[in-house]
Amino acid sequence: MRTIKLFKMLPAVFLILASVVSPIWAADRKEQFTYTPFVPTDPIMPLSQVKPGMRGECRTVVKGDDIVSFDAEVVDILDAGSSPEKLILIKASGPIVEKSGIAAGMSGSPFYIGGRLVGAIGYGFNFTDHKLGLVTPIEEMLEVWNNPEIIPSFELPPLVAEKPPSSADAREPNLQESSQNVVSADTPPADVVIEEVLPTSGDLPISGDDAVSGDRSVSSDDGDIRASWDLLVSRDRAVSSDRTVSDDSKSGGFFISGVSGRMAREMKNTLNAETVPFGGAPAGAVPPLNYAPDVRPGMAIGVSLLWGDVDASSVGTLTALSKDGRFIAYAHPLLNLGPTAAVLRTARISSVVPGIESSFKIGSPGDIIGIVTQDRPQGIGGRIGRFAPAASVVVKVTDVDSGRTYRKSFQMVQDKYMLSKLAAPAIVGCIEDLWGRIGGGTAKITAKFTGSALRGGWQRTNMFVSENDVATQVLEEFKLLMQMFAVNQFQEIRPFGVDVEVEVTQEPRVLYIEDVKVSGEGPFSPGEKVEFDITLRPWRKDPFVRTYSLTVPEKVSGTAQLLVRGGGIAEESAEYTNEAWRSISSLTILLSELDVKESNDQIVMEIRGQESLGKQIERAKSGDADALMNDKLKSEIRDEKMKEGSVRVVRANYYIDGIIQKLIKIDGDSD
């Protein structure tokens, strides 16, 4: 027995290359509206009056923006077993359907009997007679509006009150490390730049380019030099964003344009959406705002999640309007998100393409005419003339090898889960598309995040090197960054913007730590400076030497460890990481902690050691809990160690690889 596969009449997908829409900005404040029944401007025919054999017409667009109609006959009323609970089986006829049958992109095409609205086409059948389709009854489509409507506001969100940690007031502001700690320096190659990284002291700063990175292994089985990110302790992490954006079925049809092919597939998989071939507007076209569009049932419409130089838009059909400016469309969910704030646009159809599996429309979205606020099992709904706030993204890529610089910008729906899951592959897809290649090389990424809760913005710089695929490393980091900002548990951030500057080259820009030599044999005393030479070798270039000094901590005695390593290598073993006990309690503190996460372009130097056994016993006997527990943040502990001189961090314009440790003898009570 042959199985008939049922498919949702997916909207045809059209992605365009267009400029950013300036008036649409990030915001997401929720204004609650009381429930108001949706009353279509067309009279309706209830399902109880629909009988097999009744004939009517469906209205849709098959070319340009002209609404045409084709005949359809009711075959039967089917039990769907879920929402929608009933479906009307129809058989279409006439010249239009003879060419292609019922096609993807006809979702929402209204079905009338005797001038009364019965419902809209929502589903069809794969690999079978494309003249057969399923209509969602209008009574069930009206249930889209039986839900609270949430319309985003352009107002700034209220700031969540936070009590600053008591220890923060005592932190020394604007600390500058003395230049006398750099004893001498050999001359590196002209293209190597090494700069000091200062402590993050101050009133828990929100910005700093020495932030966030994570535990990194020097090599892996496939030879990549990899970077991963251990984003704080699990209980301190941002709220999980593992909300599925669709059910097991493939709701909606999306094909991503303006990004590399594999990042388009990444976004497709994230959306769990079907894709169909697309048309498109001219590259760089700006979708204008149309405050008074001519809207009619049966017209082609587009719904956009991203638009601008990166665009992801679904094209379907408008089903019905109400006098208060609301609409219903599609007759099935787009992504079944519930409340949403996607952009509603006009659409122009180029053609309907016949297919063996299914037919589909080719077209392109046009003017922005409103907002989609409901994405429900029975269809989508929204308002004409209301405009959705959005997040803004700018990506600038400089190809060091060619000397060329490229730029893309786009906006996307300000939905915390969409931002968390779609922004990262969209950004990395822009990088790959502008670079024009996928493979090994070096990427320096500087990302600045802006929003009402980020005073002056928050910035993070990192470098990545791979023998095989440098972009995948960048993707993982951006996923974590976007997750943190979009779904952090402390504060809504809007307007929300991301500016990304990228430098890429095929050359492995790696600086290897080859050797460390301590000046003098010791023993050294607590508080004394220890000088040492670090031999560094750029990839396939002559080595050079830099001389630094660290101060022996006052409490250390016996044998201590002088450790020099690349940022992110063995970061989890750093003493300031292990000693921190206090949890993160605000967005400000979260960002302050991320400011001290190491990056791959840093050289980290530290002296590690233990108190003498006698002092440890004495402290334990005192019974003073404060003496036994360190109620401080990691950032505060690292700043203290940098102030005392036992920890030192410098940043280079290279990826730093290697880890070397030396043992040094310390005078003092070693009992």
Model region roles, listed by residue range:
Residues 25-671:
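Terminal presequence/propeptide segments associated with secretion/organelle targeting
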